[in-house]
């Protein structure tokens, strides 16, 4: 259902502050959530959530709670409208916050589609603030020197997409830098 709304997004990406919004194709979103083994008990955070498609899909398909963190208020406004139109406002929230300072300690799943440098900068917080067993799924990019537990590629509309998955280790396990 979200796919029907995507063409209605305003064309503001070229003038928006920060990193450009490049939406993850819905088949990739769905596979990311499958690989994260999302279930109704999960709290899914999407850091740099854009139009909200990841957390909205997590709520629709899996009954999970979702939190979208996005700096651009226009995208947050649109994400909230999509959530309302799709009937998931009881399951999702969208915050106008900096993803480097937002509190995501209650997340059981974190999704990313950020530049590699941003992922590297987030790595220490992901490792120390998420509970052991939390899953991190990144569309396209790795997280510094932290090797993913699983990597998968898929082709959507002729474009190749990589999905990387990590599980936060217990504190005693060796941790990446």
What do these predicted ranges mean?
Residues 1-8:
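Bacterial N-terminal signal peptides
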Residues 9-39:
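Class I SAM-dependent transferase core
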Residues 41-50:
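Conserved class I S-adenosyl-L-methionine
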Residues 52-56:
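Glycine-rich SAM-binding Motif I of class I
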Residues 65-70:
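Conserved SAM-binding motif I beta-strand of class I
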Residues 105-121:
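A short SAM/SAH-binding and catalytic strip from SAM-dependent methyltransferases
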């Amino acid at each position: 259902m979200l796919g029907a709304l995507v063409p209605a997004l305003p064309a503001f990406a070229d003038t928006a502050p920060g990193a450009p919004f490049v939406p993850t194709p819905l088949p990739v979103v769905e596979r990311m959530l499958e690989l994260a083994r999302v279930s109704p008990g999960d709290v899914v955070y999407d850091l740099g959530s854009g139009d909200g498609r990841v957390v909205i899909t997590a709520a629709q398909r899996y009954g999970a709670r979702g939190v979208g963190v996005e700096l651009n208020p226009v995208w947050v406004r649109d994400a909230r409208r999509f959530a309302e139109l799709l009937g998931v406002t009881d399951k999702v929230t969208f915050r106008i916050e900096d993803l480097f300072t937002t509190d995501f300690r209650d997340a059981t799943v974190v999704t990313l589609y950020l530049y590699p440098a941003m992922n590297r900068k987030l790595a220490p917080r992901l490792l120390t603030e998420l509970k052991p067993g939390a899953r991190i799924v990144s569309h396209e990019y790795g997280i510094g020197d932290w090797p993913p537990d699983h990597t998968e590629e898929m082709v959507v509309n002729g474009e190749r997409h990589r999905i990387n998955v990590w599980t936060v280790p217990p504190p005693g396990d060796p941790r990446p830098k």
